[in-house]
Amino acid sequence: MTNKNDSKDMRKNVSKGDNPGQPEPLDGSKKVKNRNHTRQKHNTSHDM
C-alpha cells in the first residue's frame, strides 16, 4: 500500500517536471526572462 502511494506521488512529481504540458507557458515565459538576464538564469538553475 505504501508503494502505491509512493508511486502516485512520484508520478505526480515526474508529470509536473518531466511533462512540459501545463508548466509549458510558465517555462517559456521564464526562459525568455532568463535569456534576457544571464545572471538570473544561473540563480534559477540553482533554485531548481
From Swiss-Prot:
Compositional bias annotation for Basic and acidic residues: 1-12
Biased composition (Basic residues): 31-48
Domain of life: Bacteria
Gene, per the UniProt record: sspP
Keyword Membrane: no
Compartment list: Spore core
InterPro entries per record: SASP_SspP (IPR012614)
One Pfam family linked to the record: SspP
Gene induction: Expressed only in the forespore compartment of sporulating cells.
Organism the protein comes from: Geobacillus thermodenitrificans (strain NG80-2)
Membership in a protein family: Belongs to the SspP family.
GO biological process: asexual sporulation; sporulation resulting in formation of a cellular spore
Keywords of this entry: Sporulation
Disordered as annotated region, ranges: 1-48
Protein name, per record: Small, acid-soluble spore protein P
Keyword Transferase among UniProt keywords: no
